Amino acid sequence: MNKIDKNFSNQIIDEQRIDVWLFRSRLIKSRAKAQRVIHEGCIKINKIRTSKTSVKIRVGDIITLSKLDNVSIISVEDFAKRRLNAKEALKLYKEIKII
């Protein structure tokens, strides 16, 4: 019998708010900071800049995160039901490029 990890969505969740996902994936330290970064226009979803924290993302979406001098391009791989530890959070995304 397969053991199902209750921390991951296992595709039951087909979309999630961008601010929640950024926080749960540990790309940003707090949800409030994630919301601030989004409002400042530092996030693109599939090459479209967004300033709305309520935008829903799906598996396969490409997120561009601009922080100071760094630009990270990542692919959404999964969702989590809660904030994960650092090792587990790496399963939520795949880094495509860091500039």
Give the ranges of each region predicted by the language model.
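Strongly charged
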Residues: 1-20, 24, 36, 44-99
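Key DNA-contact positions within bacterial/archaeal DNA-binding proteins
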Residues: 32
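Glycine-centered, phosphate/nucleic-acid-interacting loop/turn motifs that mediate DNA/RNA or nucleotide
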Residues: 41
